[in-house]
């Protein structure tokens, strides 16, 4: 379910263009974040990424930083171009690097030492939560592994304080209130709605932040694998996990179907009969199942929301 070129396919030509006629000063790794990091991206998904570089031995650090920025910016430009040969109805690949330190105001690429300094001194709790999805996807493999070694103590901390738990809970409430489209029906919002993707993912990530240090199975960027590990460790009841995973999978499938059908609001369960029928068939329902899909989604997410509210606010 890919759109456009993968980072690994454009990194080398981007590097060649950016350093033409000059000595290579640094090595670079691309870190997948969000759904890309979790290997869960589908039709229409953004590609959330961060970039890390490491100057080569003897290279001037400032010159290496400047060169790394040129390579990264050229890579981003190439990734946004249509693939060749052209694909009918291709959607432009949206590459989002806003999860990097300091967001849009921060450097597009940082050295390993710069990341270390930031996470030690200035990072907020939600940034450690975002790192639960961080996974090297392209570039220098050894550097990618070094980045993982750097971030593991922050995303899988030995101690996750009650205050940090409260910070995550407050941030979740803020995201729900600020990012929900004005006037939207919360029961039909696939991503931010009640029992939707966000509820399941935030709950799983909170479990990881609190317990992954002691439970190796939770050290995964995959939502469903982490949920399975939580069940195995006795942190989440199997019946609750089944409800959560069922709602997450159905919301994911509907979202992909919306994109393929060209539904204008791809993060919303359609209300029109024709759209619902088409999405139902995409989800594997027999013909004439528009109402069944709607009822199933509303029921499953209603149950998932109950599980989320109980577990997200209790002392797991």
State the predicted function of each range:
Residues 1-316:
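A nucleotide- and high-energy phosphate-metabolite-utilizing enzyme signature
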């Amino acid at each position: 379910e890919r759109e456009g070129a993968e980072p690994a396919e454009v990194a080398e030509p981007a590097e060649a263009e950016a350093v033409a006629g000059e000595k290579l000063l640094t090595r670079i790794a691309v870190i997948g974040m969000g759904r890309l990091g979790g290997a869960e991206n589908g039709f229409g998904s953004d590609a959330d990424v961060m970039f890390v570089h490491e100057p080569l031995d003897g290279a001037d650090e400032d010159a290496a930083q400047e060169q790394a920025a040129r390579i990264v910016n050229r890579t981003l430009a190439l990734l946004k171009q249509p693939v060749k040969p052209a694909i009918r109805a291709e959607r432009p690949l949206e590459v989002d690097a806003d999860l990097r330190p300091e967001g849009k105001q921060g450097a597009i690429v940082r050295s390993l030492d710069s990341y270390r300094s930031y996470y030690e001194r200035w990072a907020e709790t939600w940034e450690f939560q975002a790192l639960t999805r961080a996974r090297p996807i392209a570039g220098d493999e050894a550097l990618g592994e070094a980045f993982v070694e750097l971030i593991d103590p922050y995303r899988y901390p030995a101690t996750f304080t009650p205050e940090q738990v409260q910070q995550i809970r407050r941030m979740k409430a803020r995201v729900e209130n600020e990012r929900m489209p004005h006037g939207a029906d919360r029961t039909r919002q696939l991503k931010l709605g009640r029992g939707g993707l966000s509820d399941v993912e935030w709950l799983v990530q909170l479990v990881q932040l609190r317990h992954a240090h002691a439970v190796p199975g939770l050290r995964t960027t995959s939502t469903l694998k982490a949920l399975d590990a939580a069940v195995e460790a006795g942190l989440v009841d199997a019946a609750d996990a089944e409800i959560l995973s069922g709602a997450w999978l159905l919301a994911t499938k509907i979202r992909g179907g919306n994109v393929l059908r060209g539904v204008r609001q791809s993060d919303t369960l359609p209300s029109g009969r024709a759209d619902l029928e088409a999405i139902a068939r995409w989800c594997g329902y027999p013909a004439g199942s528009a109402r069944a899909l709607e009822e199933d989604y509303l029921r499953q997410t209603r149950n998932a929301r109950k599980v989320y509210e109980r577990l997200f606010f209790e002392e797991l």
